[in-house]
Amino acid sequence: MHIAVDNLTISVPKIDKPTKAALDYVELLRESFSAKKRQKFSKASLAIRPSDFPDLSNQQLCDILVRVAYNGSHIDEDFRKHVLDLVEDQSLTWNQVLLSVIRTQSDQLYMKSQLCELITEMIRFVQIKSFHDPKHADSLISVILPTFVFLTKLILELLSDEDEMETIQIEYETKFPPYHKPLQALNTLIHDNLCGPLLAMYRSSEEVTRQLVLCSEAFSKLERPDESSVGLLDLILEKHQDNCKPTKYEYTPDGLAAYDLKNPSVRILVPIFACFRCHETSKQMAETVQIFVDIMRVSGDDVVFDLLHAAILLKCEESNNLLHLSKQHRLDFRWQSTTFFYKKLPQIIEHLVSFGKVTAEDVQKGMERALNDLTMLFDVADISWQNASFLTVLNALEPLIGSEAANPLRHRRREYMRKTASLTALADSDEKLIENTDIDRLLNAVKQVMNLQFGQNEEFYQEFIRKVNGDDCEDFDAVMSILISEGRLLEVGKAFAMKSKLAQYPSELSLDERIKKFDETFLLLTRIIVKFPGLSIGLLVNGGPGEISIADSIFYRWSMWYVKRVPRKDKSEEKSEEELEAMRIQAKVLIEEINKEVGIEEEIEEEEEDIEPEVVKEMKESGTEKEKEEEEEDGNKETKNETANDEEMPGDEQKTEEKMDTSETPAEPPIQQQSTPEDPPKVEEPAERINQEKPEEKPKEPLEPTWNEMNCALPRISRKKARRYLGLLKQGNPFWSTDNNSLNIGAILAALPSMGKLLIEEHNEEKHRVDRKSAEEHMANIIHALESMPCLFVCLVQWVDCAPASPARTLLAKTMKNALEKRVSSSSASIADDTNLPKWRFILSTCNEMIHELTDRVPVFPDITCTAFSAARRLCPFVTRDEIPDSTKLKHAWYYMCQQSWTSPHALRLLEHANIHSEYNTWIHLYITKIVGGGCGEIMKDQVDMIFGMLMMDDLNVIIRMHEIMMDFWLSEEAGNLQLDGRFDPLSMTAVIRLMANVMLISEWTLDRLINDGPPLVEFDFTSAMTPEPEDPLRREKWVFLLRQMLDRTVNRLFKILRQGVLCTVVNTIVRLIKAIAGSADCKAKRLLIKRIPPEIVFQLAYIEPQCADYALMNAYCDPKNEEHTRTKIRFLCALRRSHIL
């Protein structure tokens, strides 16, 4: 715009459109006020809104309105209230008003102090612009911090001139000093639930503290101090310091808080580590105990007492018969319990003290408490094991607690034992060991294993192999127990497996020497496998994970085929018919190759020979007098016809009988009527009926080749050759050439399966009468023929053990049992001349459990319903070596475990079998269902902690499956729609949440342990991974991948549910889970899990329901040094003050 004045052109600044619109708005508003028409938003027709001015800038309008409202010494109440109305109407924002206040340029201190009243009003409107973009959180601090600086500088400026303050107060006739309103605004700002934490969470918190201290000092320097203002400023400073302090979240779940002092989980770890995971070192066991102690908040003396309590319970149970489960019918954990009590237990306690969580005073208190409360248990154990068990453990712990603390305890126990008649002889047994007791054998075994520590491997191997020919198997088992407790069993197993392989193949040694070495190593390794059914055969022969280096060893192949164990579930994918046919062809080729390798050159497939076993021949030739009389009555002609039929068609008769056995229809009993020439059709009627029914049966489809057939094929011989070999054995002669140095011992073992089939046929009473006396004589001759290689008898027992169950198999097993027992006892009068007697005793001890299951009746578990009465009977179910427990046995095992203060290893064995067969879902669903239906807080809490301890039964499978099952059941997307679902019962959910949180904590701790323990982890780019087998060389890497995947999926699932924005029972479950994790005891597992769970989850909870989360909960998941976490925390605080829920 240009104005001409006497040939001069003056340029006047042109007003831009936003400014002009703002001035027009103010002018229109002023006119309305002057006309007594103050804007009222309840009447839209009279309202003057900024939105009616399209060119208007809200910030510029706000600046003008604030200046008009606070103009000089006059405060226009209409304009001030209009500003507040615009903020409530959201036509203006709180940050626009605050920026207008702090940017106001004025020399009048009074007017600036009056502006602080507007700051006080605006603090309640502070809110984030949008929750969707975390960067909007930065705009809050960019306004709040300058506002704080504006207030403190104004206070300091006012306090700097006390005379000026007095002048202002007189001039404006105010009751309060000029700093009153700035101080009130500062108080409101610091005490606000959003602004106060904002000023404390950034780096500016130190600057805020410094400014407040300066204000406090300025107040203290006033000549006329204002006590009320000084006190208010002190409260402001104290509040800010509280905001800066890290808050600790405390969570006490309803219903279970009263029972936190009772924790059976530590006691449950003892039988697990003693009997099922005894290969772990004492330090690893102590680390696991420590993490359980941290999670469960168990005191130090309780830990020591619980460990002693469980260990002595284990010793006592191994000495007694259980109801329906006597010692002879169950797996023997005797040496595992002995090794743990006397060797592992003191070491675990020492490691716990070295970790710093358990003190020497705690150990002393725990020992004293055990002496007071467990006296009867120690008495029972001492009498059974012939040793002063408490005194022995006390001696081991004396360097830890000191002699001053140990001597009174030792004196009390020793005096008590001397005054008790049954314990008098054992009072000094801790110092003077009784010979041939378990503790004596254990200490001798420790000394022998020390040779391995000093590198004297061959000396130890020779001493260990001599125990196979020793008089007592207990020494062997003691050494074996020490080896596995020291983590050296795999090393020893690999060494002997290599010796077995070298002895198998021709070498410079003579055949007799090779057979002797092979026999001893085979027996030694077999006993290890039998005594530790959970030990992987591949790990034993290989010395650790990785590709099997001696896969061609006949011991490895035979054991993979014929060591009876719980089968692992087949996880292979379904194959097409072409793939199956290719696999069958490959399996045949593998058999041909292995036959050629061991020196068997003949056709594998051949028709079965129609030659009757010798036992049957002898029976037919000899017969009985009764049969002869019957034959005479029938007539010579009829007898000749029957004999002719027997001679002409033995094969047809045999095939007919086999068809009758395998027919799906029940076989009819043979007709007992005599055949006469007048009625010949009646004799042939059953055979004709069978021949008519048999062709209707569909031929069975060829089965898929097993893993053993494809990966460790065994050589085999023909039936004809097996019959010839068996005939030699029955005559008491070995069937192999004793002077053939080029013989491969694998060819000897290849004959056993075919010979086993022939022996079972000979004992088939359904086809012919078995002469037990002749059968036992033949078996005795077989044992005599195997004197130079007794391990073949063990192989024969193993084959019979794995054969299909039948009466013939049972009868054969009884024959073998009687012959073996006769062999062991027959030489008792001439032991000096029988050099092989100790080895046969070793064999009897090794095969005793197999023979027992084959010959004796399996203990019948009573078929009763699970009622309170039946549970009170304390029935411990029994499982055979390859049995997969059903739900009934698992249920009774659960009742049995719940009634104890720990968990029996015989009950845990059922879980071990279920885990090996991947039947995790069965027992997990069953046991959690029992917990949820309990209804009693104390019982439910103990049961949850008991299941938590059971997670250590398996490597990681149980942890992963338990977590997945609970997530799928309680945190599924479908469950959100079931508001009245019974699974969300409040008390039951408290127990379930406790288990969920503990499972996640132990998972995170295990993951960290896998990553950091051992050599540096090599990262593999797994897209998916199956559960690794023990022999898998990438087992560690796959477990890390699976655990990470499990935890990440859980976090993603929580996000997915919460982002639906619906308040439901599932969200309530997530709230309780997040609170339970945040409120758990401070430990490494919690710190790791907290880092994995992003604070965004807590924000989502507050967004759905602001009342379900507080600031302390958010702080528990936030890292103060992480800016993203700080932004999330600001959004969380903004969500808490939302006026309504979207």
UniProtKB/Swiss-Prot annotation:
Gene Ontology terms describing biological process: cell fate specification; defense response to Gram-positive bacterium; vulval development
Major location category of this protein: nucleus
Basic and acidic residues bias spans: 614-627, 652-662, 679-703
Source taxonomy: Eukaryota, Metazoa, Ecdysozoa, Nematoda, Chromadorea
UniProt KW keywords: Cytoplasm, Developmental protein, Differentiation, Nucleus
Protein name: Protein lin-25
Entry keyword annotation includes Nucleus: yes
Cysteines paired by S-S bonds: none
Compositionally biased tracts (Acidic residues): 600-613
Gene responsible for this protein: lin-25
The UniProt record lists the keyword Cell cycle: no
